[in-house]
């Protein structure tokens, strides 16, 4: 059964229905988990750890959405849909929203450093997401 909120996003064109692909989901889980493991390597630069953790979170969140039979029109929506694709508490998916904004600042506006607290919170939130999958 799908959430009425997800169905509303379909009607608005933000999501589209697409049959789940076990191969795609397995690949997203594999890549997400590998990136999550690498993000925990303290010898890497903080910016690298942030990038790895953010991309791990995105891959795992996309896997959760694909399992429900949907595909998102943009990256941010994958995180917003976690309220309907997982049982994660609000605080966890808000960390992903904060990380998405930080990622855009670093990528598109020339931000020069990653915040260590955010990186650690992002890794923890991504681990919580992985546990649900």
PLM regions with names:
Residues 1-133:
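Terminal alpha-helical segments
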């Amino acid at each position: 059964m799908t959430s009425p909120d997800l169905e509303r996003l379909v009607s608005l064109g933000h999501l589209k229905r697409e049959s789940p692909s076990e191969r795609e989901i397995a690949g997203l889980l594999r890549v997400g988990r590998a990136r999550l493991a690498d993000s925990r390597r303290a010898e890497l630069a903080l910016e690298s750890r942030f990038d790895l953790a953010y991309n791990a979170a995105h891959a795992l969140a996309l896997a959760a959405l694909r399992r429900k039979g949907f595909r998102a029109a943009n990256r941010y929506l994958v995180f917003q849909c976690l309220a309907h694709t997982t049982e994660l508490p609000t605080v966890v998916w808000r960390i992903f929203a904060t990380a998405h904004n930080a990622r855009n600042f670093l990528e598109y506006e020339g931000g020069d450093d990653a915040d260590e607290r955010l990186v650690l919170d992002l890794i923890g939130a991504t681990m919580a997401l992985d546990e649900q999958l």
